[in-house]
Amino acid sequence: MPRYMLLLYAPEASAGEEAEREAEMPLWLDLTQSLKDAGLLVATDRLRSVDVATTVRVRDGTTEVVDGPFAVTKEFLGGYYVLECADLDEALAQAARMPLARYGSVEVRPVVDFEEVGPNA
């Protein structure tokens, strides 16, 4: 079955909004359990704040390490799900169930299966 990565992007939260997001944790736990029960969940994790991110670039043999994300953006990558879905339509339907879709965005990308396409995909 094809795999899809759901990348969860959220705007930076104010103190009040952060409390609201923490209050929705039971929704996330229920969603994750339902994905497990349906046999769709491959992996999921929440990422720490961009405040502790580090970006590494190598240019002309020189390694550059910079605190923070690669690009300044209004939304940050806060977590991900990897799901096994029958097709893109099912993956999109699951993305729409994410509580974050109401105030952020969920990017859905097919995952390359190297066993099917080989190492040159």
What is the predicted role of each segment?
Residues 1-121:
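Conserved, structured core segments of small domains
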